[in-house]
């Protein structure tokens, strides 16, 4: 029997065991397999199985380091029984070090949208309802919208002046910014803060006040264009960890809800020649994992949330 003559249910069973990242190679096997692998019902089934497997044993994240973007597998299975966690490279997705193009972004002065279909930029005029704001840190995407840390200089009654920090959301449907979204803490630029989207479901904040050794992780339990509420996911006193090595100035992180662990990416302090991952739990759990050598002393690893998908880029 030729491979193209196999019954559909058997083909789907075979394809369902193939990692999402390897489907392109499998599609070239034969025309029938290519058609089935792109079918909507199979796609939903395959992605559902991938999500279930991730929840049971491990999950995947996208990490940018050394001008390259990698898909990486994170395994926390058995950490309650003193089994060391791991972060393993799955594949390289893209390389940026040979690019001769650069995007110049001035968020204080203007907002532009790049359209991939038309390969063009669109300038958005008067998109900010409250006038000039300053945006800082990397933005994150959640359910089709983009969120940034922002701040605005405010003069209160009586002449008192201060920077007020908050989140701001850009709605790609209306091409407008929404109102301010409150943070669960009072933030100043002297403190360390980082934003993450968790599997296209929630926003996650890492907060480290400069005057304490406490690290806080906050997760959104309600997120809308005009409102957000937060719950504290984790609070850790970092002074309790004798191997506390990382700084929070270039912090990038992700969380695992099941094991209540945060993973912070950074470089070693002495030479900045190694990329490291720090696994931290609220019960005193602390592990350091090597992510490989680094030739770029000023380039810090950065993590993106990853949701399994069969969509081709």
From Swiss-Prot:
InterPro entries from the UniProt entry: F-box-assoc_dom_typ1 (IPR006527), F-box-assoc_interact_dom (IPR017451), F-box-like_dom_sf (IPR036047), F-box_dom (IPR001810), SCF_F-box_component (IPR050796)
Locate the F-box domain: which residues?
1-45
Give the matching SMART domains.
Answer: FBOX
Q: Which Pfam families match?
A: F-box, FBA_1
NCBIfam families registered for this protein in UniProt: F_box_assoc_1 (TIGR01640)
PANTHER family from the UniProt entry: BNACNNG10540D PROTEIN
> Could you tell me what this protein is called?
Putative F-box protein At3g16820
Q: Please give the organism.
A: Arabidopsis thaliana (Mouse-ear cress)
């Amino acid at each position: 029997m030729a491979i193209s003559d196999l019954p559909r249910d058997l083909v789907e069973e075979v394809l369902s065991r193939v990692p999402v990242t390897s489907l392109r190679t499998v599609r070239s096997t034969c025309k029938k397999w290519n058609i089935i692998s792109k079918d909507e019902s199979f796609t939903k089934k395959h992605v559902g199985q991938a999500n279930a497997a991730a929840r049971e044993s491990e999950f995947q994240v996208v990490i940018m380091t050394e001008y390259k973007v990698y898909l990486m597998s994170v395994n926390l299975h058995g950490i309650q029984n003193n089994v060391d966690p791991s972060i393993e490279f799955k594949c390289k997705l893209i390389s940026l070090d040979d690019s001769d193009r650069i995007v110049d972004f001035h968020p204080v002065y203007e907002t532009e949208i790049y359209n991939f279909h038309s390969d063009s930029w669109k300038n958005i005029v008067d998109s900010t309802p409250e006038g000039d704001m300053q945006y800082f840190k990397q933005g994150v995407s959640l359910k089709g919208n983009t969120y940034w840390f922002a701040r605005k200089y405010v003069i209160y009654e009586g002449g008192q002046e201060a920077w007020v920090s908050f989140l701001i959301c850009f709605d790609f449907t209306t091409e407008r910014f929404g109102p301010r979204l409150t943070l669960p803490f009072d933030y100043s630029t002297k403190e360390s803060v980082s934003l993450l989207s968790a599997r296209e479901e929630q926003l996650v904040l890492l907060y480290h006040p400069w005057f304490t050794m406490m690290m806080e992780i906050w997760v959104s339990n309600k997120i809308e264009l005009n409102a957000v509420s937060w719950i504290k996911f984790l609070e850790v006193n970092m002074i309790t960890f004798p191997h506390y090595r990382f700084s929070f100035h270039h912090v990038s992180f992700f969380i695992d809800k099941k094991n209540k662990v945060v993973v912070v990416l950074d470089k070693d302090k002495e030479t900045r020649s190694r990329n490291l991952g720090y696994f931290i739990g609220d019960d005193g759990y602390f592990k350091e994992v090597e992510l490989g050598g680094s030739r770029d002393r000023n380039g810090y690893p950065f993590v993106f949330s990853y949701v399994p998908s069969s969509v081709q880029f």
